[in-house]
């Protein structure tokens, strides 16, 4: 469903829940629909169920917005695995890896807006996690796809720059960009040497709709595109090496950082048009200011600890 469809679905699932007295159902449904692009109807129902379970585990008298935010994280990325203890060296590597993704996304115009970064292990294999707020697009330009590839490669390039070595943590990233590079060259007609052709096929299929010679050219162009994006990502992060270090150090200190933390460290994203995350956070700030007269803000230390309060956060395969 689109954003209006998600909002309507949330209205249905919010009705039977015991919400905190200061929660406006209409505003909450609007906010949750903004935070859940790409979610199915079943996913939206799971968010509401998880929010109720989280509130029960925390022995909260009612469900508030923070419980829904934690529920979205859990649906996206799975359970926190604090029992999975990383060595100091591994934790540092994960922090710089995630910082590389975050800084890349911050300085690429078409990258998905960042909401939160975590180095708390989650789910089955994820050692780090980033939550983004992608725009609901139906068409993608070459520039948008290339920026997405650069952000995905940011973790591996950060490891190369800071440690002079690479780890297996980037395997999922490499799989994603290789598949995207293949689609750009073989399906979207965005490669000059192959021309405006589209070979819609599964990479694993035994029968290819092109000749062996074209297959060799396709392999060559996919590799060339990945290397071009790698060089661009290296140039970007080399110019922002100090920023990567700032973000990584804060991650090691707090384990979870938000978009507000990124703004404090790096300044606002250097692009004229506000993205969805900016608009969402501006709206969130206005709502918070409206409620200040009726309820005092939580203590600062509580704000910093909030991402760790529940045993339910979200997880995405390490970018």
Predicted regions and their residues:
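Short, flexible loop/turn segments with low-complexity composition
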Residues: 24-25, 65, 88, 275-283
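Conserved C-terminal "switch" segment of AAA+ ATPases
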Residues: 1-69, 74, 78-79, 152-160, ...
């Amino acid at each position: 469903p689109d954003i209006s469809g998600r909002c309507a679905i949330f209205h249905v699932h919010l009705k039977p829940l015991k919400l905190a007295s200061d929660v406006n159902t209409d505003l909450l449904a609007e906010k949750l629909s903004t935070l859940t692009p790409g979610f199915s109807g079943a996913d939206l129902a799971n968010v509401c169920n998880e929010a109720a379970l989280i509130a029960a585990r925390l022995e909260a008298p009612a469900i508030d917005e923070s419980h829904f935010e934690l529920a979205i994280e859990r649906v996206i990325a799975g359970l926190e695995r604090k029992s999975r203890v990383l060595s100091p060296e591994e934790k540092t590597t994960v922090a710089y890896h995630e910082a590389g993704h975050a800084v890349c996304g911050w300085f690429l115009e078409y990258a998905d807006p960042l909401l939160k970064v975590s180095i708390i292990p989650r789910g089955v294999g994820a050692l780090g996690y980033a939550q983004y707020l992608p725009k609901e697009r139906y068409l993608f330009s070459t520039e948008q796809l290339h920026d997405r590839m650069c952000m995905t490669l940011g973790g591996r390039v950060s490891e190369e720059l800071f440690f002079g070595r690479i780890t297996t943590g980037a395997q999922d990233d490499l799989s994603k960009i290789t598949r995207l590079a293949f689609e750009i060259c073989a399906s979207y007609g965005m490669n000059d040497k192959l021309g405006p052709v589209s070979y819609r096929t599964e990479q694993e299929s035994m029968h290819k709709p092109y000749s062996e010679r074209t297959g060799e050219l396709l392999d060559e162009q996919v590799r060339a595109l990945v290397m071009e994006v790698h060089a661009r990502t290296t140039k970007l992060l080399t110019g922002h090496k100090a920023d990567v270090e700032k973000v990584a150090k804060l991650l090691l200190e707090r384990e979870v950082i938000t978009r507000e933390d990124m703004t404090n460290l790096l300044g606002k994203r250097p692009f004229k048009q506000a993205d969805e995350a900016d608009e969402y956070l501006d709206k969130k700030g206005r709502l918070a200011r409206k409620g200040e007269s009726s309820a005092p803000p939580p203590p600062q230390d509580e704000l910093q600890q909030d991402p760790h309060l529940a045993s339910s956060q979200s997880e995405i395969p390490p970018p």
